[in-house]
Regions:
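Helix-to-loop junction immediately C-terminal to a conserved catalytic motif
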Residues: 92-96
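ABC ATPase C-loop
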Residues: 199-200
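Conserved catalytic motifs of ABC-family nucleotide-binding domains
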Residues: 83, 114-116, 128-139
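Alpha-helical transmembrane segments and their short interhelical loops
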Residues: 226, 234, 240-241, 246-250, ...
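Catalytic Walker B motif of ABC-type/P-loop ATPase nucleotide-binding domains
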Residues: 207-211, 216
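Hydrophobic alpha-helical transmembrane segments of multi-pass membrane transport proteins
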Residues: 411-479, 531
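Topological signature of polytopic alpha-helical transporters
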Residues: 1-66, 71-73, 80, 103-108, ...
Length: 650
């Protein structure tokens, strides 16, 4: 991290002046930020402390931040954690959640942006890379290009992707799988370059990057910043936040901004930074990294009250010196000069040649299918997990019998109960395992304006339907015929249809919860609890409670009509074909007093006692059950609409 600064500063001075001269000669684009302030209201205490939780205090995140940057320049925003770097990027790009607490102006080419124009002007690369693990680099960029550009020829898309990969030195690893923590793929630096390449496909003139070097080794971090510097010098504006840059990067930045507690402590070229702090009485030692030295100098030490007050006063003195300096006056003059141009240049929007909603849905479906198709173990588990459960049931049950004394009724009812209760849970496991990565990438790409979140949800639903049909078909075929259920094709068809809908409903219900709850583990636990409650209400257990609990039963039994398991359990008589079964006679000389099981000699008696309306309402229950599918699909789409609002306010 350390090294002599003098030679570096000489190169920096030369490079910085060259960049400024070039930008001043013919500035095609510019960004001007004037007096940006941002506050949030936070609760004082935790939720369990009611008196403190109800109280709020106002926290200043940004305070009167101003700067100006022109095309051909790269600006690095420095500062410790909590200094306001990321919030500043969010404010520039229009991604702030609580917009009512935002004050100030953002100008592009002297024009103040409208609310809906921010997304179409700035390309934003977040700190974490959201990429699909099983795609190659070329596939990932190709699908992004298809979502970005209106329907073009394959030749055009390929040339576009190849050009971007060449620009970011990705061509030699184009066919390499991206990978994840579970299996090896590309390196961290290569992942970051893929994220940048995805943004370049939209031909942006302004690029914002949040901590692009985080988690990378020194060499890779240097390469990323060098690459961004080259991109900036190709007539782009590049603004990055950076936490601990090496001294070798000093010469690459055309402008450097230092943030502390939401205030701009300094903004200017590298040589101006050295001169400014030296004039303030804080010369950088020769063997020190100037970045580290000045960031530490402008940070507030909170280890003790005395140190906090002392360092805060020092920061305020430096801020005051900067606000009264020629450097700051020059920044404000550049902002006013840009606004006062008679013929303002147009706003440099990204490529807005977007395809139709249906075509985007088709591309998302193709990308999702291609990504999951390479996960061989995942495909096998999705197809066979229901069958594995079937093996477990068959092992204990083997064949259905007709002997009441050996549990004929319990076996039939229990088999059907297990067959229709387990598939919703396997559907939940599928959604919890597969959808969170798609949700993460849709959160990012929907912010970039590539598509809406509901389109990703719908693409996933269309994707998993064939897998659900095949998985349930394998399970149904095995368990129905191996258990010796009623040998009739129509009965098997009903059995398959009921199990299929229960499996799909389980996955759809999980999608609904994934829309509003971030943690997949909480979602899984929540769906399991809902299914458990559905078993209690839907199976008719409440209707058989003791008379002392009749009041509770009456209150909760109303909810059974909103629970899909209530309608599924109504098919137990039909699936078990009880009315066609004549149970084996009891032993001679036995009586119902000795053995109550002898009260049942025909299956119809079991139906009349436990499911009195099941047969007469068969068609109605079947239609209502399948009506849950479009209903839950619509609710899932609405839940991700809610998610869009929640994320927008974070």
């Amino acid at each position: 991290m350390s090294g002599r600064v003098s030679p570096t500063l000489e190169r920096s001075s030369s490079d910085g002046q060259t960049g400024e001269t070039k930008a001043t000669a013919q500035p095609s684009d510019s960004i001007s930020v004037r007096d940006i302030s941002y506050t949030v209201r936070e609760r004082i205490g935790p939720w369990w402390n009611v008196s403190l939780y109800r109280k709020k205090w106002t926290k200043q995140i940004l305070k009167d931040v101003s700067f100006h940057i022109e095309s051909g320049q790269i600006m690095g925003i420095l500062g410790n954690s909590g200094s306001g770097k990321t919030t500043l990027l969010d404010s520039i790009s229009g991604r702030l959640g609580y917009k009512d607490n935002f004050f100030g102006e953002v100008y592009v080419n002297g024009r103040q942006l409208k609310k809906e124009q921010f997304r179409d002007c700035f390309s934003y690369v977040p700190q974490s890379d959201t990429l699909l693990s099983f795609l190659t680099i070329q596939e990932s960029l190709t699908y992004t290009a298809l979502l970005t550009l209106q329907k073009r020829s394959n030749d055009f898309i390929k040339k576009k992707v190849d050009a971007v990969m060449a620009e970011l030195s990705l061509s030699h690893i184009a066919d390499k799988i991206i990978g994840s923590r579970i299996f090896v793929g590309i390196s961290g630096g290569e992942r970051r370059r893929v994220s940048i390449a995805a943004q370049l496909l939209q031909d942006p003139k302004v690029m914002l990057l949040d901590e692009p070097t985080t988690g990378l080794d020194c060499l890779t971090a240097n390469q990323i910043v060098s690459l961004l510097s080259e991109l900036a010098h190709r007539d782009r504006i590049v603004i990055i936040t950076i936490h601990q840059p090496r001294s070798e990067l000093f010469r690459l930045f055309d402008k450097i901004a230092i943030m502390s507690f939401g205030e701009m402590v300094f903004c200017g070229n590298p040589m101006e930074m050295i001169t400014f702090f030296s004039d303030c009485g804080y010369s950088c030692p020769e063997q020190s990294n100037p970045f580290d030295f000045y960031v530490d100098l402008t940070s507030v030490d909170t280890r003790s009250k005395e140190r906090e007050l002392e360092t805060y006063r020092r920061v305020q003195v430096i801020v005051s010196a900067y606000k009264n300096s020629e450097i700051f006056i020059k920044e404000l003059a550049a902002i006013e000069r840009t606004k006062s141009v008679k013929e303002l240049p147009p706003i440099p929007f990204k490529n807005k040649d977007s395809p139709s909603a249906f075509y985007k849905l088709w591309i998302l479906l193709r990308r999702t299918t291609r990504n999951f198709s390479r996960d061989k173990i995942g495909i096998i588990m999705r197809l066979l997990q229901n069958l594995l459960f079937g093996f477990f049931v068959a092992f204990f049950l083997l064949r259905l019998r007709t002997d009441l004394l050996k549990g004929a009724v319990q076996d039939r009812a229990g088999l059907i109960y297990q067959c229709i209760s387990a598939p919703p849970l396997t559907g939940t496991l599928n959604a919890v395992a597969l959808y969170p990565p798609l949700r993460a990438i849709s959160d990012q790409e929907s912010k970039d304006g590539l598509y809406k979140k509901w389109q990703m949800v719908l693409a996933y639903i269309v994707h998993f339907l064939p897998f659900s049909v095949i998985s349930v078909a394998i399970f149904s075929t095995f368990i129905y015929w191996s258990a010796g259920m009623y040998p009739e094709a129509s009965r098997f068809g009903i059995f398959f249809a009921v199990i299929l809908v229960s499996h799909i409903i389980g996955e759809l219900l999980t999608l609904v919860m994934l829309g509003v709850i971030q943690n997949p583990n909480i979602v899984q636990s929540g769906v399991v609890l809902l299914n458990s409650a559905g078993v209690i209400v839907g199976s008719g257990l409440l209707s058989k409670l003791d008379k002392s609990l009749t009041l509770i039963s009456n209150h909760f039994s109303f909810f059974q009509f909103f629970i899909f398991l209530f309608f599924i359990y109504s098919f137990i008589p039909s699936l078990g074909r009880f009315w066609k079964v004549n149970f084996a006679a009891c032993e001679p000389n036995s009586s119902t007093a000795i053995n109550p099981a002898c009260m049942l000699s025909h299956g119809i008696q079991f139906i009349e006692e436990n499911f009195p309306d099941a047969l007469s309402q068969f068609t109605t229950n079947f239609l209502i059950l399948y009506a849950f599918l479009p209903g839950l699909t619509i609710i899932a789409i609405l839940s991700f609409k809610i998610r869009e609002r929640i994320i927008g306010r974070q």
